[in-house]
Amino acid sequence: MGIFHTVDDNEIKSGENTDIYFVRTSDILALEGKNPVVTVEITAQNLPDEWGVFCGLDDALSLLEGLPVDVYAMPEGSIFYRGEPVIRISGHYRDFAKYETSLLGFICHASGIATSAAIIKACAAQRPVYSFGSRRQHPAISRMIERSAWVGGVDGASSTSAPAGIPLAGTMPHAFVMCFEKPLDAWLAFDRHAPGDVPRVMLCDTYCDEKREALDAAKAGASAVRLDTPSSRKGDMRQILEEVRWELDINGFPDVGIFLSGGLTADDILKYRDIVDAFGVGGSIANAQVIDFSLDIVEIEEKIYSKRGKKSGVKEVYEFDNGDHLLLPKGVTPPEDAKPMIKIFIKDGQILTKPDMQKSRARVLSSIENMI
């Protein structure tokens, strides 16, 4: 046992981290001599928005590697819609039944974060968005949070646990400013000692009026000023931003940007994106609503089945150049210009290919350009 309340990799990989009814199901099926060949599909019947971003495939493949199954899936970073299968598994049911809990956990959580990040990134209209929310979740999953946010399109992350290849971004906390006699001393110290490649973004709302501190920071050499209390201000945040921008411009600092953070939502970004140069987003990404995926049998011993409320039979998803999707039963010929989205990733337990985080992110960014 570790010192923290976390589940280790071995418990997940062995299938020990599961719901108890899967243990009982497997035991009783074994006693009855039943282990049918089935095909299951993972779909979401309800989404937080009109579309979702599929994420978490990397962990899902690592979980299923070595099991006697075939796994098909949409590429990570694919846009998907309600009722579309994102993963399909074929094999003897008892060989993978106990892995359902972890499998769904991997993709439900990661896809929820990636989806929220993609929506926020689309709302930002080309302005940088940084993930500041790993502190809003258990530290054991901070790497997953930052990876999922990156796949969703953010431009950097604050957590030092972010996977390699994700730029780290962060300015300074209020505590840093408060350790000095006055904000100016803090900003000058930061400028003296921070690495040269770290932008001189100065936090400007610790003690005084934002526009006063912003102007002082600009005079001290700030490349941008960061405002971090939009949700706690009793005044009109729009007015505050306009005043800061006005004072910077009229005093000869038009190139000093405004960085906004602090409880931001997608609606906030839509409201402020015309005047703000970059955003730091915490809980709206890290605490995103999970995608409510479910795993359902659609075929048993090559015969189509479904439970009530689900569509029976194996399905394929096709995508057109304009981004539209088409769902068809397997075996039905699609239109010539429709491209199949579901690919094979595991054959007889062997991984054929794994997601590339950078390609997954590029797939999202190319898809969301005109979505908001």
Predicted regions and their residues:
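Gly/Ser/Thr/Ala-enriched C-terminal appendages of enzymes
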Residues: 1-22, 32-34, 49-51, 61, ...
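Flexible, solvent-exposed loop/hinge segments and secondary-structure transition points
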Residues: 1-94
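Structural beta-strand/beta-sheet cores of well-ordered domains, especially the beta-sheet scaffolds
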Residues: 27, 36-42, 128, 198-200, ...
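A generic structural signal for short, non-catalytic loop/turn and secondary-structure boundary residues
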Residues: 33-37, 64-67, 82, 124-127, ...
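A broad, low-specificity signal marking well-ordered, structured residues that form hydrophobic/aromatic
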Residues: 40, 69, 87, 130, ...
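Buried, small/hydrophobic-residue-enriched core segments of structured protein domains
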Residues: 48, 78-80, 87-253, 266-267, ...
